[in-house]
Amino acid sequence: MAVVWMQQNFQQLIEQLKGTLGKLGARKLIALGLVGAALMGAILYTSIYLGRPSYETLYVGLSRDDVNRMGLALGEAGIPFDVKSDGSSILVPIGKAENARMYLAEKGLPTSNNAGYELFDNMGSLGLTSFMQEITRVRALEGEIARTIQAIRGVKAARVHIVLAEKGSFRRGDQKPSASVVIRAEGGFSAESAQSIRQLVAAAVPSLDASSVTVLDTNGHLLASAGEGANGAALMTASLEQQVASHVDDSIRKALAPYLGLGHFQTSVQAALDTDRRQTKETTYDPESRVERSVRVVRESGDSRNNRNDNATGVEQNIPQEQIQNRNGESSTEKMDRREELTNYEVNSKTVSTVSDGYSIKRLSIAVVIDQARLLQTAGTTPPPANFVDQQITKIRDLVATAAGLNTNRGDVINVTAVNFLDPAGADMEPVSAPWTDTLLRQSGSYANALAILAAVGLLIWFGLRPLLRDQNVKPAGTEVAIREAGEVATPNFIGGAESVGEGVQAVIGGPAAYADQMKTSLSDLRQRMRMPAKLRLEQMIEMDEERVAAVLKQWIHETASGREADPAKASAMPELKAA
């Protein structure tokens, strides 16, 4: 019986659905079909879009030719891939990157314009001249250096040209090698990187000086050249001054932050440096540490006499005689005595040679601006004491001078001023969050998919389920009038009580839902009614009040004759009533 009742209810539901669809009309049926097709399309698109595999990066920074070749190779291998909007990155599904790289490596992809020492792999030694070997060696060296330069941050592509010295037997002067580097730079490349490239190329090429390397970018801007010796020193000095000023500024901020708080002061530091190279040689002697090394003593004495004869010259002097008589003359005696002493000492000496190749601070200029409102808050009283701000400024000036290491002898200048800040304290120090528009744009794809699904479901409910539910809930006016006219008709109570015929008729006409509500009175009543067929229940109702049942049947016949479509429940109940 339960199976038969379920079959009858299912057939009744099918009949009701057919009747409801028939009442909708052609326009509503077409609209309902379009909404259903749109919903199915949205569901299918969403399932395909969300069900596709996630991708991971295979290669980045590729040229357009490499992307085309790699795309063809991956397509032949049956490996799905995708290309980013920038056109320089290839993506493959997660888990297939290793296989894709191995397959592309087998095909020799991605290729590089900067070929290195692999050039010798494809060259045969037969018929190869020394000139060709030298050219190939230079090309390989250029390619290897270019690959290394491309690994530097901010360098997207590089090209290296090297001119080596030619060896000649009759050449008087030695020719020095030179090199030039052309790079395609992107964000993050600085002037220091250009100097690093010069040092790299100079170290990779024998006998190449860094000053002989020229670096420029693809826009034609000269980044480093041989004639920038003075400019290079000036750039280095400016960089050192900036570093020193930044260090002093950090020291001042660390000293003032606990006292005033971040955002309540601003500092500015300018540093002037002396980067001249100095060489100093100093020799110091210690006279107290002398040691006697040698002593030399010279003594000299002499005795001399001088007699002078006063004899006249004549004939007598020419005659030989035994003895010549001397006449009295002048005589003198001289005696000399001299002593000389020389002592040599060893004295300790110290020679200091100093070479200064660094820098020294010539002058510091420091400016500090303090929020006056913050100073007044630290007073603790309202109004603050007299000259409170001036006293605080004096303390802060001394604190800043100590933190910065100021030296008045070299002309350092410091200025501390208290003013009212325009912006709220610390407003510029708060972290800036990303605007909500950026978040919305990043999630726009997910939002669009969700809105499409919700819109499709809403259209289906509005144009499809809503008319069905509305037609099911609307009862014919004639039925309600007939029931009101019929009144309450007593029906036999199988449990021992009684109920109205109107409730029984409403349960039969209202369909399975109304019939189930009536059967909830008790468990025993439900079981008995489940076993009883509809024909038996109608017969019992007719036996109890034939007049009211006849009135209901007349109303149904009147509705059928007027051209309105009868309810399927009424149509199924009329043959049974006639038979009864």
UniProtKB/Swiss-Prot annotation:
Lineage top rank: taxon: Bacteria
Name by which UniProt lists this protein: Flagellar M-ring protein
CC per GO annotation: bacterial-type flagellum basal body, MS ring; plasma membrane
Region annotation (Disordered) ranges: 273-340
Annotated compartments: Cell inner membrane; Bacterial flagellum basal body
Stretches that traverse the bilayer: 29-49, 445-465
Assembly and oligomerization: The basal body constitutes a major portion of the flagellar organelle and consists of five rings (E,L,P,S, and M) mounted on a central rod. The M ring is integral to the inner membrane of the cell and may be connected to the flagellar rod via the S ring. The S (supramembrane ring) lies just distal to the M ring. The L and P rings lie in the outer membrane and the periplasmic space, respectively.
Alphabetized UniProt keyword annotations: Bacterial flagellum, Cell inner membrane, Cell membrane, Membrane, Transmembrane, Transmembrane helix
Family matches, as Pfam families: YscJ_FliF (PF01514), YscJ_FliF_C (PF08345)
Compositional bias segments (type: Polar residues): 309-331
Membrane topology: Multi-pass membrane protein
Composition bias type Basic and acidic residues, residue spans: 274-308
A biological process from GO: bacterial-type flagellum-dependent cell motility
Molecular function terms, GO-annotated: cytoskeletal motor activity
Major location category of this protein: membrane
UniProt record similarity statement: Belongs to the FliF family.
Keyword ATP-binding: no
Summary of the function given for this chain in its UniProt record: The M ring may be actively involved in energy transduction.
